[in-house]
């Protein structure tokens, strides 16, 4: 459910009436500069992306700058989480689910002038699925056996096995189309087909995008001439930049405790919407004592999720008991599987051979929700005799190296942002080091059907397995906290996929 909070009207701006202007001897041919519609936007983000190509790295900040602004896909995902055509205007799926035929838009050009056609679409998908691919979602493309391009407007994917989520996956940032001649430079100078072109990047400060005057889809052309993404990590500085007018919007405001500070502001409005941000404390299940399910269950039962939400995010959040959000089809409430129960948690630890508890370290990235959640958990674990040390870990560089690459950790905490990503527990390797053949079988089975009811039932079984086996401690779903100028129109209030989609954004003067 979305809560909308609005405040008092903006300051009244007086304008000369036409009659008064004429009586003063003025000739009016257009809007005066003071009245001209504003066409620039200064938008804040907490985390600066490490690069600008979402097809080569996973951090969500990349897509929050470039997805649907610079880059587009064969299909896209709208604000309601629904699949919509984009660079593919239509598609057909064979009865056996093994052949996907896409009809592509015509007259589309990349920002470097190169034509988008079936050949460049094939290049993009081959690059994503090839042996040398570093695509963060390479598994999306694993079932593509071959690709044909009968003509410039037709792309045919031949699959080795039915893949029920393929169309949905093709709408993700990792699946965008890239220009063959410039793809290698996409990390620093991205080139796509979108309504905005990359203009500049002053690292440590800002990224600037400029309107693409030659954008192919005139119905969705950008209304803004320039967008500047400003990177501000400190929540107090974020609030100050908004109140001073240095920023027009902060769609992912990082300090829930400061939301009330905007009450009564004549210029700004706040929004609270939905996201896919699942805050989980993942354990390295290949290490003792986390290789014992009883220990993991004990830690889960030592946690009062409501207290975590209150302490970490000012009570704004939804408790979860598995790796799934209430926004997603097939959701089941699993918070009652391992409920808060200190005595039961102590008994499980004793049964596992740790009657006096144990000591371990959690690696916590700097994003506000992580250390705050960790501190609340630390106090709760102490009640069952477990000592948790908190090690601040810079995100993304050190966190990715320690957790994702080296697996050098006991526990970590992070918000998984991708929608319907429960299948990450079937990945091998992945940072949980989790091995569960029955779970893996469910993830394979769910791709063998495109029937929503069947998929939802399978996802329900998968949620239950994770709720009982707890390879991660499932805490809460973060809301989307937005603060922006009330004259801004078109910013997404809900976030079915991490993004700042700006083609529909304009100023209502």
Predicted segment positions?
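Detector for C-terminal structural segments
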Residues: 38-42, 202, 206, 211, ...
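Alpha-helical secondary-structure segments
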Residues: 42, 117-124, 154-158, 194-195, ...
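N-terminal lobe/hinge region of extracytoplasmic solute-binding protein
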Residues: 44-95, 126, 191-192
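A structural "hinge/loop" feature
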Residues: 47-64, 87-88, 114, 136-137, ...
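Gly/Pro-rich hinge or "lid" segments in bacterial periplasmic/extracellular proteins
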Residues: 82, 163, 168-222, 226-228, ...
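Aromatic- and charge-enriched surface segment that lines or borders ligand/interaction sites
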Residues: 89-134, 150, 156, 289
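Surface-exposed binding/hinge segments that line
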Residues: 103, 137-179, 200
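Ligand-site clamp/hinge motif
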Residues: 184, 214-260, 378, 387
């Amino acid at each position: 459910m979305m809560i909308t909070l609005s405040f008092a009207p903006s300051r009244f701006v007086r304008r000369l009436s036409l009659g008064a202007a004429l009586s003063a001897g003025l000739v009016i041919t257009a809007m005066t500069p003071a009245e001209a519609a504003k066409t620039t936007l200064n938008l804040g983000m907490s985390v600066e992306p490490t690069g600008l190509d979402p097809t080569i790295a996973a951090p969500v900040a990349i897509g929050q700058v470039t997805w649907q602004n610079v880059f587009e896909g064969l299909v896209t995902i709208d604000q309601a989480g629904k699949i919509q055509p984009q660079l593919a205007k239509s598609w057909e799926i064979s009865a056996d689910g093994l052949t996907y035929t896409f009809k592509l838009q015509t007259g589309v050009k990349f920002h470097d002038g190169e034509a988008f056609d079936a050949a460049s679409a094939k290049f993009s998908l081959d690059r994503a699925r090839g042996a040398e691919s570093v695509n963060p979602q390479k598994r999306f493309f694993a079932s593509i056996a071959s690709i044909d391009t009968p003509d410039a407007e037709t792309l045919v994917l031949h699959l080795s096995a039915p893949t029920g989520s393929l169309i949905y996956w093709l709408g993700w940032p990792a699946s965008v189309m890239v220009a063959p001649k410039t793809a290698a430079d996409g990390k620093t100078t991205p080139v796509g087909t979108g309504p905005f072109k990359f203009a500049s990047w002053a690292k440590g400060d800002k990224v600037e995008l400029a309107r693409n005057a030659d954008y192919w889809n005139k119905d969705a052309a950008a209304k803004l001439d320039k967008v500047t993404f400003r990177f501000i990590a400190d929540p107090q500085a974020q609030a100050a930049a908004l109140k001073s007018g240095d920023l027009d919007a902060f769609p992912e405001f990082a300090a829930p405790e400061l939301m009330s500070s905007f009450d009564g502001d004549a210029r700004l409005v706040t929004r609270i919407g939905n996201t896919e941000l699942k805050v989980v404390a993942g354990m390295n299940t290949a290490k003792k004592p986390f290789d014992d399910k009883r220990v993991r269950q004990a830690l889960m039962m030592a946690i009062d999720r409501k207290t975590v939400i209150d302490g970490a995010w000012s009570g704004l959040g939804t408790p979860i008991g598995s790796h799934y959000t209430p926004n997603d089809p097939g959701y089941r409430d699993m918070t009652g599987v391992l409920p808060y129960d200190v005595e039961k948690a102590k008994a499980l630890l004793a049964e596992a051979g740790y009657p006096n508890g144990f000591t371990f370290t959690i690696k916590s990235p700097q994003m506000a929700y992580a250390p705050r959640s960790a501190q609340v958990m630390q106090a709760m674990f102490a009640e069952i005799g477990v000592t948790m040390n908190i090690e601040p870990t810079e995100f993304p560089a050190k966190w990715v190296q320690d957790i994702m690459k080296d697996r050098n950790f006991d526990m970590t905490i992070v918000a998984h942002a991708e929608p319907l990503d429960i299948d990450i527990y079937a990945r091998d390797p992945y940072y949980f080091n989790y091995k569960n053949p029955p779970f893996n079988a469910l993830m394979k089975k769910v791709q063998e059907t495109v029937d929503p009811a069947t998929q939802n039932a399978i996802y329900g079984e998968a949620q239950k397995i994770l709720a009982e086996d707890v390879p991660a401690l499932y805490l809460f779903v973060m809301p989307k906290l937005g603060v922006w100028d009330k004259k801004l129109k078109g910013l997404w209030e809900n976030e079915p996929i991490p993004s700042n989609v700006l083609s529909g954004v304009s100023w209502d003067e």
